[in-house]
Amino acid sequence: MIEKSFDTPCGAIRYWINDAPVNDAPCLVFLPGLTADHRLFERQIEYFEDVCRVVVWDAPGHGASWPFEFDFDLMDKARWLDALLAREGVEAPVIVGQSMGGYVGQAYAQLFADKLRGFVAIDSAPLQRQYVSAAEIWLLKRMEPVYRYWPWRWLLRSGTNGVATTEYGRRLMREIMMSYDGNKARYARLSGQGMWMLARAIEADLPYEIRCPALLICGERDRAGSCVRYNRAWHKKTGIPLEWIRDAGHNANTDRPEAVNRLIGDFMDALPPAKPRG
């Protein structure tokens, strides 16, 4: 994987891309969740980098995409992603978003529906207003002070054991979390701003319709918020296929990478040919 940088008015986004294999396979774009970085998808990158073109980023303010001004919203992230992909010549991406990455994918679908070839949500939830209560939105807007108040050791424990069920998944997330060790203020700001962005995107009450082939993946033991409930409702309302990952938590792709990789691979194989652009 080749590390690159994409400049925005708020800072530089770091991302990684492989030397694209010469085939007709779609480009997989991996978007990690809130506070996680590109390492969240290391097992997916290992599996797919010799199969197709692969892109993964450290989201704005995350990992190597720092320093970064917190003066952007979810739609800005989607626009930056589109510009980044355009620079790399990616015209019909398949977005694979975990948690917050899935929200970015839905924002991308709202803005660039004609470009999106496929969408896979891993332990994410729908952005449509109908799924979320007013109380939930109110809380999302006020989470930064909560993160500032909680002791770091508690945040570290909940951010590792609370999102993964396996030794590998927890160890990986702990390594990622430790990049914020000694700078809890950055972690609180990053987390709070992410929740605020999410609330604002939901309040916008946009269609966020997924018009391309899509797949929902969720860990059976996901305890992050109401993710399990949201996925059931999302599947029931839209008919988007939903696959449950046995014994997996919120980071299902780290707890059961072989199962998630198989589902993504099968999803890719079933995609119709990309429509010619012109």
Which residues does each PLM region occupy?
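N-terminal cap/lid segment of alpha/beta-hydrolase-fold proteins
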Residues: 1-12
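Active-site loop/oxyanion-hole signature of alpha/beta-hydrolase fold enzymes
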Residues: 9-10, 16, 55-96, 262
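Conserved HGGG/HGGXW glycine-rich cap/lid loop of the alpha/beta-hydrolase fold
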Residues: 11-64
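Gly/Ala-rich beta-loop-alpha elbow adjacent to hydrolase catalytic centers
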Residues: 97, 101, 105
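Flexible "cap/lid" loop of the alpha/beta hydrolase fold
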Residues: 110, 117-149
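Conserved alpha/beta-hydrolase catalytic His-Asp/Glu region
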Residues: 130-132, 150-209
